[in-house]
Regions:
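N-terminal small-domain helix-loop-helix segment of the aminotransferase-like
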Residues: 1-64, 71, 351
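Short acidic capping loops at alpha-helix termini that bridge into adjacent secondary structure
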Residues: 55-59, 79-82, 171, 189-190, ...
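Active-site phosphate-binding strand-loop segment of PLP-dependent enzymes
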Residues: 105, 110-175
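Conserved PLP-binding catalytic core of the aspartate aminotransferase-like
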Residues: 255-256, 260, 266-301, 318, ...
Length: 351
């Protein structure tokens, strides 16, 4: 479905600055389109090395971080391979593991009633699951999609030290949080960090992601990556986005402020529980009203959120992307009327 207020895919509501887009177009126009892009995008790799503080030979770029995830799992997962994840989490991990013949080892996330309520990683249970299953791969999304939960670097390091199995930290939303696992790469050759340009960097439409790891791991993952996987338009746009880091960082600060404003407002809305988040989205739990009815009622008011009721432990939840102030206000208004339409008395908080 489409709606004027589209807050269902965790996109950045603000585009790359116009001047940066024009620089990209000029650069692309100067190249012959009949030629392949660079097999090794050195300009982008060097820009990413400066941006991340990690060596260029330890960076692999992909057509979105989804491609990097797929290539990584192709060289690490086969029939019967165990992969540990905490759930609920990004569904692509399980999808790719299943396609490759692997087996998921699922560890339920914990939950704190708050206030504010939040989902929590249970690191002890993850460690127990790794040891019991002898899983060679553990994947952690931090901040986690769809719960917004972060895993502290000390906990990541604990996972890395517990055997030589691969620890994969998906940091697609790391710009919205305080923590990153990248400084641990130097000490832990079994650590892999994944990132994307689709969220904070405003390039969802151009599909650019990257993987940070030891050069040895990168060389192995490259064997599963298709050649010429990133067109030169996307390469140029990614470099331009990195050159606009100050403007994009300012947008991140605005989104974080909006996230906290909206979560505070939701604390006064009866019938819903909002979960704290370190990302550019958050979960709301419909305590009395049917969440699917609430979703449909908001869509009738041209506000599109994400129905995540099929996820484990989220049977009554919707996921909401933080948008502009106007979009967020439209969401708050639509939610109030949607709760009423879904059969709930907002004034009393009872069905």
């Amino acid at each position: 479905p489409k709606a004027p207020v589209k807050i269902n895919q965790n996109e950045n509501p603000w585009d790359l600055p116009e001047a940066a887009k024009r620089r990209v177009v000029e650069k692309v126009l100067a190249r012959p389109w009949c030629r392949y892009p660079d097999l090794v995008p050195r300009d982008l790799l060097e820009a990413l090395a400066r941006h991340s503080g990690w060596r260029p030979e330890g960076i692999l770029v992909g057509n979105g971080s989804n491609e990097a995830i797929e290539a990584l799992l192709r060289v690490t997962v086969g029939p019967g391979t165990k992969v540990v994840v905490s759930e609920p989490t990004f569904t692509l991990y399980a999808l790719l593991t299943r396609i490759l013949g692997g087996e998921m080892v699922r560890v339920p996330m914990g939950k704190s009633a708050g206030p504010p309520a939040r989902f929590l990683y249970d690191v002890d249970r993850v460690l127990e699951a790794r040891r019991a299953s002898e899983a060679p791969v553990t994947i952690v999304c931090s901040p986690n999609n769809p719960t917004g939960t972060s895993l502290e670097p000390d906990d990541v390091e604990q996972l890395c030290r517990d055997g030589d199995g691969l620890v994969v930290v998906d940091e697609a939303y790391h710009e919205f949080a305080a923590a990153t696992a990248v400084p641990l790469l130097e000490r832990h050759p079994n650590l892999v960090v994944l990132r994307t340009f689709s969220k904070a960097m405003s390039l969802a439409g151009l599909r650019v992601g990257y993987l940070l790891a030891s050069p040895e791991i990168v060389r192995e993952v490259e064997k599963a990556r298709l050649p010429y996987n990133l067109n030169f338009f996307s390469q140029a746009a990614a470099v331009a986005a990195l050159e606009e880091k100050d403007a994009l960082a300012a947008n991140v600060h605005r989104l974080v402020a909006e996230r906290e404003r909206v979560l505070a407002r939701l604390g006064d809305v009866p019938g819903v529980r909002a979960y704290a988040s370190d990302a550019n989205f958050f979960l709301i739990e419909c305590l009395s009203a049917d969440p699917k009815a609430v979703f449909a009622a908001m869509l009738r008011r041209e506000v599109l959120v994400r129905d995540v009721t099929s996820y484990p432990a989220l049977e009554r939840c919707l996921r909401v992307t933080v948008g502009t102030a106007a979009e967020n206000d439209a969401f708050l208004h639509a939610l109030g009327t949607a709760l009423t339409e879904a059969g709930m008395d907002v004034a009393s908080g009872r069905a």
